């Protein structure tokens, strides 16, 4: 077991993240770019680091991510979900702490479709009485 890697997929909205973990220096690579190059918002970086900080593996595992679809927030959520599931592969004892934090649950909220006869999913067209 010279090169042991732990794989998992994470999803959020329309984003899908494929995550690989391996013991290392703690570098995070997203779509062949560093996290600083790929993600602008500090809150998104914090979301991605949450499972690593919570389990005490921050700086001990190299994270490689391939993420497709969605926007910035959806991709960050998908990466967090994927990292959490990969951490379970790495160490099943993390299940309790990750489950309590809600990182293992797939957030099923997606955009509601627009309905015909309406301006958007719920909003009606503007009504003029006269």
Curated annotation (Swiss-Prot):
Coiled coil regions in record: none
GO MF annotation list: RNA binding; structural constituent of ribosome
An example Gene Ontology biological process: translation
Keywords from the named record: Ribonucleoprotein, Ribosomal protein
Pfam short name (any one): Ribosomal_S9
InterPro entries found in the cross-reference section: Ribosomal_Su5_D2-typ_SF, Ribosomal_uS9, Ribosomal_uS9_bac/plastid, Ribosomal_uS9_CS, Ribsml_uS5_D2-typ_fold_subgr
Keyword Ribonucleoprotein included in the entry's annotation: yes
Signal sequence, renumbered to the chain: none
Spans traversing the lipid bilayer: none
GO CC entries: cytosolic small ribosomal subunit
HAMAP family: Ribosomal_uS9_B
UniProt record similarity statement: Belongs to the universal ribosomal protein uS9 family.
Name under which the protein is recorded: Small ribosomal subunit protein uS9
Gene it is expressed from: rpsI
């Amino acid at each position: 077991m010279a090169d042991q890697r732990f794989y998992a997929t994470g999803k959020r909205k329309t984003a899908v993240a494929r995550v690989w973990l391996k013991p290392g220096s703690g570098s995070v690579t997203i779509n062949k770019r560093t996290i600083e190059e790929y993600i602008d918002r500090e809150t998104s970086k914090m979301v991605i680091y949450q499972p690593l900080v919570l389990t005490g593996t921050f700086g001990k595992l190299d994270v490689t991510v391939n993420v497709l679809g969605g926007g910035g927030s959806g991709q960050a959520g998908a990466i967090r979900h994927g990292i959490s599931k990969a951490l379970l592969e790495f160490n099943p004892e993390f299940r309790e702490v990750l489950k309590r934090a809600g990182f293992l649950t797939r957030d099923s909220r997606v955009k509601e479709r627009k309905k015909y006869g309406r301006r958007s999913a719920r909003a009606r067209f503007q009504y003029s009485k006269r």
